[in-house]
Amino acid sequence: MKNEVKKVVLAYSGGLDTSIILKWLQDEYNCEVVTFTADIGQGEELEPARKKALSLGIKEENIFIKDLRDEFVKDYVFPMFRANAIYEGEYLLGTSIARPLIAKTQAQIALQTGADAVSHGATGKGNDQVRFELGYLAFNPDLKIIAPWREWDLNSREKLLAYAQKHGIDISKKKGKSPYSMDANLLHISYEGLVLEDPAHAPEEDMWRWSKSPKDAPNESEIIELDFQKGDLVAINGEKLSPAGLLTKLNELGCKHGIGRLDIVENRYVGMKSRGCYETPGGTILLKAHRALESITLDREAAHLKDELMPKYASLIYNGYWFSPERMMLQALIDESQIHANGRVKLELYKGNVMVIGRESANDSLFNAAYCTFEEDEVYNQKDAAGFIKLNALRFIIAGKNGRKF
């Protein structure tokens, strides 16, 4: 394939690893390289990536830096949260949900620039290689895919650094840069590697980059109100913001109160177990609020069906199948369930906790106090329950008459 590639679009962060990949592509494939850097709220200046690419010989017209923050939240994060998606009971899928958008945009740039190949910096051990490549092939099955970590012999940090020095790539460490392998976007930040590779070893406090420790969070709680329309967040404390602005605001509130830290061992799609630590402050608040709203607006059987389907939906995202027909089918069902998910949820934030203290919906609430009151009944006849119970017990009654023992 090396002699067949003419132009390749590289998912480029400007960091050491992808800068080495850039140079390696030039040397090994002797092809033109286009760089694509996505702003999905990782919190870093992206212009240095442009300068780094220029210094490595990339033409100005072959450097693409795109602000995808609103698209990321509106078209990926919000649809996922309509489903209350959680992988293996804890993980809010912060890395998983970002990959489809990056892959789609990268494939679009390939079409725009006439590139015949795409490349990424995911290793051959992880989930991201699957997520990226399923995305590429969904949009253009004719694209060639170059995954350097599956090809080269630079399989140690020492070899990578030696390669960088040999080719004049700056290896100086950014001031304050974490030694952990990290991934960040508007939804979360993740940490892997080093002492975290021992699942018995507790993470150091200085590893966490975003949030206060719950122990150091304010001693006074904070009350907030979130407004939803059709299952999507539209305002915080009455203030309407862009999708990215809303998640940014929730992150600020969550970080302030030590909310959203997570330390888990998860099952990767490729078959191994991996330990990761995550901070998802805004997402943790959003999930709690959305479920609270659904508790008054969603029919019982619809809610239970959603809960049954959610693990499958979450696994599809985790494993890289965002663009699959089965995920889209589930999304259509989920979105139908959100037609009446309109209302307001009141939350109290305090030292790592998110507590629901109120929920209301002016036109869509199914909660009717007249039916569930502990006071005198006016609309419900309690005698009706006897027949309901007898009919539901009919199979037990028949089995008992036949001598069946339980």
Swiss-Prot record:
GO MF terms, alphabetically ordered: argininosuccinate synthase activity; ATP binding
- Stated family: Belongs to the argininosuccinate synthase family. Type 1 subfamily.
As for subcellular location, the record says: Cytoplasm
Provide the top EC class. Answer: ligase
Q: Name one Pfam family in it.
A: Arginosuc_syn_C
NCBIfam families according to UniProt: argG, PRK00509.1
Residues at which L-citrulline binds: Y91, S96, N127, R131, S181, S190, E266, Y278
Q: Sorted alphabetically, which keywords does the UniProt record give? A: Amino-acid biosynthesis, Arginine biosynthesis, ATP-binding, Cytoplasm, Ligase, Nucleotide-binding
Protein's pathway = Amino-acid biosynthesis; L-arginine biosynthesis; L-arginine from L-ornithine and carbamoyl phosphate: step 2/3
Alphabetical GO CC annotations of the entry are: cytoplasm
**Do you know which Gene3D superfamilies this protein is assigned to?**
Argininosuccinate synthetase, chain A, domain 2 (3.90.1260.10), HUPs (3.40.50.620), Single helix bin (1.20.5.470)
Supply the name of the protein: Argininosuccinate synthase
UniProt-annotated binding residues for L-aspartate: T123, N127, D128
InterPro entries, A to Z: Arginosuc_syn_C (IPR048268), Arginosuc_syn_N (IPR048267), Arginosuc_synth (IPR001518), Arginosuc_synth_CS (IPR018223), Arginosuc_synth_type_1_subfam (IPR023434), AS_cat/multimer_dom_body (IPR024074), Rossmann-like_a/b/a_fold (IPR014729)
What's a GO biological-process term for it? Answer: argininosuccinate metabolic process
Q: Which organism is it from?
A: Campylobacter jejuni subsp. jejuni serotype O:23/36 (strain 81-176)
Self-association state and partner proteins as the record states? Homotetramer.
Q: What residues does ATP bind to? A: A11, Y12, S13, G14, G15, L16, D17, T18, S19, A38, G121
Give the catalysed reaction(s), semicolon-separated.
L-citrulline + L-aspartate + ATP = 2-(N(omega)-L-arginino)succinate + AMP + diphosphate + H(+)
EC numbers listed for it are 6.3.4.5
The protein's predominant localisation is cytoplasm
